[in-house]
Amino acid sequence: MALIVSKFGGTSVASPERIKNVAKRLIAMKQEGNDVVAVVSAMGKTTDELVGLAAALNDHPSKREMDMLLSTGEQVSMSLLAMAIQALGYNSISFTGWQAGITTDDVFSSAKIEDINADRIRGALDTGAIVVVAATD
């Protein structure tokens, strides 16, 4: 059994129909006997919309608050994809990067990964789940 990690950008998850298509692709990988992890970005133009909202409120928002705001786009995508997989009859769980065991430095807006503790992801895979992780690019 192989471990397959696939990254899906904003265009791939830009609409409910596209999310369903991604879910079907991931399920096909699972049906081939693989452990499957998907990493997803925010839907379509979500990041641009969030940046616009921030700009409407503050000409110079802090990098920390921008990181917090922008991470919500990925959280929406990860949850919707897990729901789509579940609707097709398969076990799925979503994680933020932090929940998945990814630790970064504290350089806001350009953090680097310092450590990955894959125990939580491995535990979910061991239950047969398709794991969906929010990207933090």
Residue positions per predicted region:
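Nucleotide/pyrophosphate-binding catalytic subdomain
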Residues: 1-137
